[in-house]
Amino acid sequence: MKRTIQTLTLSVFIFSAAIAWMGETPLQAEEPRRPVPVIFDTDIGNDVDDVLALGMIHALEVRGDCRLLAVTITKDNPLAASFTDAVNTFYGKGDIPIGICQSGVTPQSGKFNILAEKKDNGKLRYPHDLKDPQQIPDAVTVLRTALADADDHSVVIAQVGFSTNLANLLQSPGDKISSLTGKELVKQKVKLLSMMAGAFEKIPHKGKLVDHREYNIVKDIPAAQTLAREWPTPIVWSGFEIGLNVAYPHESIEEDYNYTSHHPLAEAYILYNPPPHDRPTWDLTSVLYAVFPHRGYFDLSETGTVTVQADGLTTFKPGDGQQRYLKLTDAQRVRVVEALVQLSSQPPQK
């Protein structure tokens, strides 16, 4: 009798669990997947990882994982915007708003932004319509417009260049776009800032481990200091050590982009530093975390605050604060490389 009661009890439990499971599943299945609204802030032209990261974003948008609201640029050369527009057009998104700054920082065209002017038989190899610098709006205007039109606490910003644009945004007053100041607008609209900047481990150099003053920081130290000190939402930093340990396999450049006779990502990579060079994926890691923060691609430090020193060194202090930095295991590294290659090389769907 005891055995019969136990069996009956178990049967009722299983049946109840099944009913509960059946009742919850349709609700979960019907819940729409909301693409993550992304703003991409980049110094495109100074290194090729920016270009691969932009290609990633377009692949993620096709998959329904994100929606690119705007691209703002911190490299002060007009070809940076033209090449960005050419890449966006290649992926069928030539209408994405693009904004620039006039900072005087890295004014050279760079090794591959010249692809924006490359012609074959008199026609642009990579068509685009952003050719006159006078028609390109200021980055702060583009940022304020994108944020003002977004839902509250929804936008993720992937900053993979200097902090110039976002520091200027914080200091912007209310205007016809929004009565809110830049800092108020960020606090109301931004969910997360995922940024490639700084270094949170010592870096190997000539057989020694040394402090590293990272490029994106040192090119505009005051802006980086402002951002670290005043940004009002959570920040996750992808330090120099992360991308350094996740190299993009050059075999992918040689083999995975051949579905078209000319590919802006592959050609930019080759012009910057051709195979057999495996380029670190600094900027791509920030984009991957921005869109997939809960997929386990990376671990996180404890919460705290980041301070940017006068010489560009970044230091992290655990405790109260909304800032963390990425950490990476060997097992995660393998998975991250696979994700970055698959996304960067995904053919456009126009």
Language-model region placement:
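Positively charged n-region of N-terminal signal peptides that target proteins for export
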Residues: 1-10
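Bacterial N-terminal signal peptides
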Residues: 9-20
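N-terminal acidic, glycine/proline-rich low-complexity segments
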Residues: 26-350
